[in-house]
Structures are given as structure tokens and as C-alpha cells.
């Protein structure tokens, strides 16, 4: 009996290689047991760095003794994009990954926040190299993440993203909701990205000579009156999966017919419990 080939998955994040979220992701993938795992992640937190990379100075990489069993682990003094560039262009240049996963981020990257996000920046970089990729983020705090049944869902997401054929590599921005009572998630919804974004007000915290130091405070979502499907799905305790097709702008290369086909294919393929009511009204 011929064994199915195992995926080669590159795992990165922006919270740092020691963060809880990336450890959870490794655990889920190990439980699913369909891929060989390679961790290349920042040594320190890189939140909000988007697609920044080390252009004007060197970056550094060193082997890392990862506490869970993986094929290899490397810590990078740099951004998530640096991690992907080093992994694809140097560390694994002779045998690149089939898929790049970034996360699980401590905090949401839904709506327009995906443009700020270094978690999402990593998957955009992977897409630029022709590799499908998925960003994963947990609303509020990683402590809200619900591990039950997530191994099968993560596997379904990975298999769909790799197997779906399109002229350009497919990426998804996946966000897990959080509720005050931590009630079980209802399912997963394929949506387009919303317009909401995190807004803060600069606050002066100190002055040293002519130099003034600021931080942002009163951070909250700026939303329009016409709430997006993504926002409503998360508010109603659904996981969201937003497709990102790389060629300059999200979805720029998809016709309405192609997008409808992608949505239909996703909804047929990516489920983890068929008894869930995916047609529940979000209103």
C-alpha cells in the first residue's frame, strides 16, 4: 500500500518563536500527523511590522532547540518576512515548503488590520514566491483559542489551500472569534475582508530635551455603519477565512465567477463537523 506523501510545512509567526500561539499550532499539526514541520520564526516579537524586512542591515539566524518535535527550528533576528525569505531562499532552497503557516497570532488581524499585520505579511511573502499560505489569528487573546476538533479543521484548511488550483498561489487570512463566555465556535465562514481597522490616539508619555515620546491609547475598532460579513461572522462566533490572491491587490485576479467557485469549493471541503448549522442567519 502506497503511503500518501506528507506535506512540508514552514511555520512562522510575529509574536516570536517562544510564543504560545505558535506552540499551539505545532501541537495541532502534530496531532493531525499529515506534514513534516519546519519552524523559522522571529527571536523577538514583531507585531505590526507588516511586510517589513531587513533591507539596510544584516539579519541573523541560528538553530533553535524547539520544545516540541519538529524537523528543524530556526530563530531569526528579524521580521516574519525575513523568516520566509531566509527559509525559501537559503535554509530550504533545494526543497521548498508546500505551504507556509503564520500564527497563531495573539490578537485579531481581521478587516483592514491585515495590512498592518506581520502575521499576514509572512503569507504575502510566501505567495510572492509562488507558495500557498495561511495566516491564523485569535481575537482578543490566545487564551480564547479552543483546541477541541481544531486539528481536523487545520488539516482541511491546509489541504484545500495547497490543492486548489489557480493561476496564482492562494492565501487565507483565518481569524478565530472570542466571546465573553467562551462559547463553542459555530463553524467557519468564507468571507471577504471587512473595512474595520484598529484605531488609536497618540498620547505624549514623556519629553527628553527636544525629543517627545508617544504611545497609542484608546485602541478600538473603527467600523462603518454597514458592517462587513467578516465582522458579523466573528461577532456571531464563527471562524472566518478571507481569501488573499496575490498579484498586487487582494482578489485582483479573480472574476466574480471564479470567486463564487472558490467559495463553493471551500464550503464543501473545509468543515470539521457536518452537524453544525452553517446556514444560521447572522442578523
UniProtKB/Swiss-Prot annotation:
Native source organism of the sequence = Chlamydia muridarum (strain MoPn / Nigg)
Write one Gene Ontology MF term.
5'-nucleotidase activity
Q: Which family does it belong to?
A: Belongs to the SurE nucleotidase family.
Q: What class of enzyme is it?
A: hydrolase
Q: What is its main location?
A: cytoplasm
Q: How is the cofactor bound?
A: Binds 1 divalent metal cation per subunit.
Cellular component terms per the entry's GO annotation: cytoplasm
Which annotated residues bind a divalent metal cation? 14-15, 47, 105
Q: Which cofactor does it need?
A: a divalent metal cation
- Catalyzed reactions: a ribonucleoside 5'-phosphate + H2O = a ribonucleoside + phosphate
* Pfam hit, one: SurE
InterPro entries assigned to the protein according to its UniProt record, in alphabetical order: SurE, SurE-like_Pase/nucleotidase, SurE-like_sf
Determine if Hydrolase is one of this entry's keywords: yes
- The protein's name in its UniProt record: 5'-nucleotidase SurE
Amino acid at each position: 500500500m502506497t503511503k500518501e506523501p506528507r506535506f512540508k510545512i514552514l511555520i512562522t509567526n510575529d509574536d516570536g518563536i517562544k510564543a504560545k500561539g505558535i506552540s499551539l499550532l505545532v501541537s495541532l499539526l502534530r496531532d493531525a500527523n499529515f506534514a513534516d514541520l519546519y519552524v523559522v520564526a522571529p527571536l523577538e516579537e514583531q507585531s505590526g511590522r507588516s511586510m517589513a524586512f531587513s533591507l539596510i542591515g544584516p539579519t541573523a539566524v541560528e538553530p533553535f532547540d524547539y520544545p516540541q518535535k519538529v524537523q528543524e527550528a530556526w530563530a531569526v533576528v528579524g521580521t516574519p518576512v525575513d523568516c520566509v525569505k531566509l527559509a525559501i531562499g537559503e535554509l530550504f532552497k533545494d526543497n521548498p515548503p508546500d505551504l507556509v503557516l503564520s500564527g497563531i497570532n495573539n490578537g485579531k488581524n481581521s478587516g483592514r488590520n491585515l495590512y498592518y499585520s506581520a502575521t499576514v505579511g509572512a503569507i504575502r511573502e510566501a505567495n510572492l514566491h509562488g507558495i500557498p499560505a495561511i495566516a491564523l489569528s485569535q481575537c482578543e487573546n490566545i487564551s480564547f483559542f479552543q483546541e477541541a476538533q481544531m486539528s481536523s479543521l487545520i488539516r482541511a484548511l491546509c489541504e484545500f489551500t495547497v490543492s486548489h488550483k489557480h493561476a496564482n498561489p492562494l492565501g487565507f487570512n483565518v481569524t478565530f472569534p472570542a466571546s465573553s463566555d467562551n462559547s463553542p465556535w459555530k463553524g467557519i465562514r468564507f468571507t471577504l475582508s471587512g473595512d474595520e481597522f484598529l484605531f488609536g490616539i497618540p498620547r505624549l508619555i514623556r519629553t527628553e530635551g527636544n525629543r517627545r515620546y508617544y504611545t497609542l491609547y484608546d485602541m478600538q475598532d473603527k467600523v462603518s455603519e454597514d458592517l462587513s460579513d467578516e465582522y458579523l461572522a466573528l461577532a456571531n462566533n464563527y471562524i472566518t477565512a478571507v481569501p488573499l490572491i496575490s498579484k498586487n491587490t487582494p482578489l485582483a485576479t479573480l472574476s466574480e465567477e471564479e470567486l463564487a467557485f472558490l467559495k463553493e469549493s471551500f464550503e464543501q471541503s473545509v468543515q470539521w463537523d457536518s452537524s453544525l448549522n452553517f446556514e444560521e442567519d447572522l442578523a
